[in-house]
């Protein structure tokens, strides 16, 4: 059983993933889901992401994999992180839409994932976390080039 803080962390991450997906599905403009920016509140997203930091870090692996380089990356491929077979075999390539879908209920989206997060019910919270992750991934101070 995961602690409440780890469950909340997973919920916040899931919310971020889901929020990205919602924007990609309903956004305007012709950008693809992997490159379109989510119209979320990055300040609120950063606050929500603080809870995720019990399991995840932006630029390094922890209990969960790092989030720098998340968008456009195939699931289960961060070097040095031990993923579940289910995640490695999922075929997911992370973009805002996939992240949003995943964050609704990670366990249901990837049956067999190690991520013990119930998910984010709030589409707004998901969008905000995803917007923050997109912002962070473009900021070399947060996600330095390797």
Short names for language-model regions:
Residues 16-19:
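Short, linear, compositionally biased motifs with a strong N-terminal bias
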Residues 21-24:
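C-terminal motif of bacterial Sec signal peptides marking the signal peptidase cleavage site
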Residues 26-48, 144-146:
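Electrostatic cytochrome c docking/interface patches
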Residues 45, 49-58, 129, 133:
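The canonical Cys-X-X-Cys-His
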Residues 42-46, 57, 61-95, 116-117:
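Gly/Gly-Pro-rich "capping" loops immediately C-terminal to redox-active cysteine motifs
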Residues 95-144:
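C-terminal capping alpha-helices of c-type cytochrome domains
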Residues 9-11, 26, 53-56, 144:
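Secreted/luminal cysteine- and crosslink-motif detector
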Residues 2-14:
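Bacterial N-terminal signal peptides that target proteins for export
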